[in-house]
């Protein structure tokens, strides 16, 4: 008889479950902080695998992009249709310091703006800010009825559309190229550029629902920690105290 392993006897018991390890035990929570132009600084929390060996948690967090509603950042429901993208640039302890990375409209808001009997005019401009951020801004506008107009439709002629688009690009170029990214963000929140376009194009054709619907960050300058700390209200350098001048008094030791 051949001597060998009895396969039937060496088989393990069926139905034994493999021990499962909860993946959240290997992760840590980090707070996401919004930069200066926004009213609410605490955006939320994010998870990352704990630092083990050569894998650093900070490196895994840097470059992460989070999308937040502008209504949550400003505590104003009127901004609910706009989404802000923030990029994690630095990690300080358990805090992720972010910078502005883009802006977009919700799809339902965009679809609600498009209607019959009016002309849609779009324009986009690629511009560099004073702090060397290369961004592309997309603008959208719609024609509206003139005062005392009887006609149902509000279609603009091709020459009027070209003139309005030229005006839009000029205003966006002027407003965006003369300020830093932080100052531009401050202009985008209250729709300063949209109102300026609406006011300046009244002579060509009256417009409504003029918005910067999208902002895309194409290129960033070299990372500056001091500038990021200033955005988050923190100084990159240690505070030095003032010199205190006092009269020197020689201490006399008592004789023992």
From Swiss-Prot:
GO biological process: translation
Molecular-function GO terms, alphabetical: structural constituent of ribosome
Keywords from the named record: Acetylation, Cytoplasm, Ribonucleoprotein, Ribosomal protein
InterPro entries: Ribosomal_eS1 (IPR001593), Ribosomal_eS1_CS (IPR018281), Ribosomal_eS1_euk (IPR027500)
Keyword Glycoprotein among UniProt keywords: no
Disulphide connectivity of cysteines: none
Main location group: cytoplasm
N-acetylalanine: modified positions: 2
GO CC terms of this entry: cytosolic small ribosomal subunit
Entry keyword annotation includes Ribonucleoprotein: yes
Record localization: Cytoplasm
Assembly, per entry: Component of the small ribosomal subunit. Mature ribosomes consist of a small (40S) and a large (60S) subunit. The 40S subunit contains about 33 different proteins and 1 molecule of RNA (18S). The 60S subunit contains about 49 different proteins and 3 molecules of RNA (25S, 5.8S and 5S).
Matches recorded under PANTHER family: 40S RIBOSOMAL PROTEIN S3A (PTHR11830)
Family: Belongs to the eukaryotic ribosomal protein eS1 family.
Protein name: Small ribosomal subunit protein eS1
Source organism (scientific name): Fusarium vanettenii (strain ATCC MYA-4622 / CBS 123669 / FGSC 9596 / NRRL 45880 / 77-13-4) (Fusarium solani subsp. pisi)
């Amino acid at each position: 008889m051949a001597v060998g392993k009895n396969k039937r006897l060496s088989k393990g018991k069926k139905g034994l479950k493999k021990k499962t390890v909860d993946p959240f035990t290997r992760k840590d929570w980090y707070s996401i902080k919004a930069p200066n132009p926004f009213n609410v600084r605490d955006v939320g929390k994010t998870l990352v695998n704990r630092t083990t060996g050569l894998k650093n948690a900070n490196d895994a967090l840097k470059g992460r992009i989070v999308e937040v509603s502008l209504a949550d950042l400003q505590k104003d429901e009127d901004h609910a249709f706009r989404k802000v993208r923030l990029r994690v640039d630095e990690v300080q302890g358990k805090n992720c310091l972010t910078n502005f990375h883009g802006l977009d409209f919700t799809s339902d808001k965009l679809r609600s703006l498009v209607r019959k009997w009016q002309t849609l005019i779009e324009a986009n401009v690629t511009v560099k800010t004073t702090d060397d951020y290369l961004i592309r801004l997309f603008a959208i506008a719609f024609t509206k009825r003139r005062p005392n107009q009887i006609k149902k439709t509000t279609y603009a002629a091709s020459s009027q559309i070209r003139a309005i688009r030229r005006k839009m690009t000029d205003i966006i170029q002027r407003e965006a190229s003369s300020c830093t990214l932080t100052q531009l963000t401050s202009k985008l929140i209250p729709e300063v550029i949209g109102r300026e376009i609406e006011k300046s194009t009244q002579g060509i054709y009256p417009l409504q629902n003029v918005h910067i619907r999208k902002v895309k960050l194409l290129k960033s300058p070299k990372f500056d920690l001091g500038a990021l700390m200033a955005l988050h209200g923190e100084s990159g350098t240690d505070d030095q105290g003032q010199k205190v001048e006092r009269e020197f008094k020689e201490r006399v030791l008592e004789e023992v």
